[in-house]
């Protein structure tokens, strides 16, 4: 098994409800280690750039509006198979479909306000990490 890094974001719906500590604890309890973390409030342009892959999707405008509506906590996580492990701990995008005990089952309000975002591949992780962090900010 390989130690790898992935990107994680705690979204505005969760930061508004002061859940950053509880969510980070769930990630750490799963064996993931936070090697970089900062609180950011993205503007519309940053949200549009970060979620550019969804630009043609019908929910894009709503997503950009939501993601720029409040602070987020962006993190780099490290661990054995970190990408898959993070996705497992997050749970299904739709909290109604998420397994018991996952972040989205426990904390999400809806499919759009689903508390967290995580990279879905090594390539995406690299892109998302470098969007928010310089190498000097990642301390393993």
Curated annotation (Swiss-Prot):
Enzyme Commission number(s) from the entry: 2.7.4.6
Cofactor(s) listed: Mg(2+)
SMART domains: NDK (SM00562)
Top EC class of this enzyme: transferase
Cited InterPro entries: NDK-like_dom, NDK-like_dom_sf, Nucleoside_diP_kinase
Active site location: 117 (pros-phosphohistidine intermediate)
Keyword Electron transport set for record: no
Subunit structure as annotated in this protein's UniProt entry: Homotetramer.
Protein name (record): Nucleoside diphosphate kinase
Lineage of source species: Bacteria, Pseudomonadati, Pseudomonadota, Alphaproteobacteria, Hyphomicrobiales
């Amino acid at each position: 098994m390989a130690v790898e890094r992935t990107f994680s974001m705690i979204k505005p719906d969760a930061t508004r409800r002061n859940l950053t500590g509880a969510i980070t604890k769930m990630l750490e309890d799963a064996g993931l280690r936070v090697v970089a973390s900062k609180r950011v409030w993205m503007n519309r342009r940053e949200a549009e750039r970060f979620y550019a892959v969804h630009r043609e999707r019908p929910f894009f405008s709503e997503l950009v509006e939501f993601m720029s509506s409040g602070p987020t906590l962006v993190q780099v996580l490290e661990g054995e198979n970190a990408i898959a492990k993070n996705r497992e701990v997050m749970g299904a995008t739709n909290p109604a479909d998420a397994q018991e005990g996952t972040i989205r089952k426990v904390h999400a309000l809806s499919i759009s306000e689903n508390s967290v975002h995580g990279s879905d591949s090594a390539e995406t992780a690299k892109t998302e990490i470098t969007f928010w962090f310089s190498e000097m900010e990642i301390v393993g």
